[in-house]
Amino acid sequence: MENVPKENKVVEKAPVQNEAPALGGGEYQEPGGNVKGVWAPPAPGFGEDVPNRLVDNIDMIDGDGDDMERFMEEMRELRRKIRELQLRYSLRILIGDPPHHDHHDEFCLMP
């Protein structure tokens, strides 16, 4: 037998119509990775409000303690009045006295 080099016959395949195209990328890259160089600016006016909001919150924490104390005192007073009215109404029911209106608390438009 003779040593005759054999030719390798390479058969090329015809492209398949339903096959998706390659997404690219090298040997060590995942296809569809991060796109570099694309930058979107923040919304207009977005950065202007942030420092002001922080300053307002700090002022509210530091300087508005008196307002908060006043508000809490008003809430305590309202709760006390509501409790008193509920107790008065409950006592009238227990005693059997029919409820009547305190006309001095009402506002009337008639002269």
From Swiss-Prot:
Top-level taxon: Eukaryota
Modifications made to the protein after synthesis: Ubiquitinated. Degraded by the proteasome.
Keywords tagged on the record: Cytoplasm, Metal-binding, Ubl conjugation, Zinc
Binding site for Zn(2+): 108
GO cellular component: cytoplasm
Family: Belongs to the BEX family.
Record protein name field: Protein BEX5
Organism of derivation: Homo sapiens
Organism phylogeny: Eukaryota, Metazoa, Chordata, Craniata, Vertebrata
Gene behind the chain: BEX5
